Amino acid sequence: RGICAIPYVRQRDNATVYFPVNIIGNLYVSNGMSAGNTPAEARTQALSEIFERYAKFRIISEGLCLPDVPQAVINRYPRIAAGIQGLRDAGFGILVKDASMGGQFPVMNVTLLNPQDQGCFARFGAHPRFEVALERALTELLQGRALDALGGFPAPGFDLEEVASSPNIEIHFVDSSGVIHWNFLGDQPDFPFHDWNFSGTTAEDYQWSVNAIQAMGRDIYVADFQHLGVYACRVLVPGMSEIYPVDELEWENNSIANPIREAILNLSDLDHDECSDLMET
């Protein structure tokens, strides 16, 4: 029947490349999807999400320790500082960290430590503007949760292999409730603090994001969508924006049931032997 594929435009040379829908659904899921008032705004948000998850997964899986953000820097943003202080006043330990990995990525981290159950809950936010990235990390921490629902997260672990395992990383993608390695809470950061800010106009934010990813040797592919006057896009960066490992295509492929689809759609027409074969399958 052929392969269902969607055209994407490679930003490096404007070449059109077709990506099979099955590969997108298996490996990238919702990562890099965005809508906005303008193409530049939506694409910047999509790339920011890709930056966030790429940095987050590397930091968690490699057990990296991030530098703290000085209080003087946090105080530049009174609303954010007040939100952080409010959580501390409620009895939670709040760590604010620079997740740019040495100024490479526009990513920030806010981590909550619950003294009641020793749970550790780390959230990340990304945007070329430092303030927006920090605010996103803080709001992600409380997204869909009241203060009395900030318990039940796992305590940090010592087994880096477990922390870096695909099931744990998958949980971090779903709701960030996976295990964090104790190294993350250490006092010897793997990178110095960078007081970064890569922001300019919306168009400049997008161009900076593109340049940063292409400087890593990665290609950016964009599919544009318009519906009822609203612009949306989906961005893929092979080697960077995958949520699931390529092995998923072999072991957990969404198309695994294709050979029995016809039988399922015609159950009433199957004879006894065909029903038995389908059940065994």
What is the predicted function of each stretch?
Residues 1-281:
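Helix-biased "structured C-terminal domain" signature
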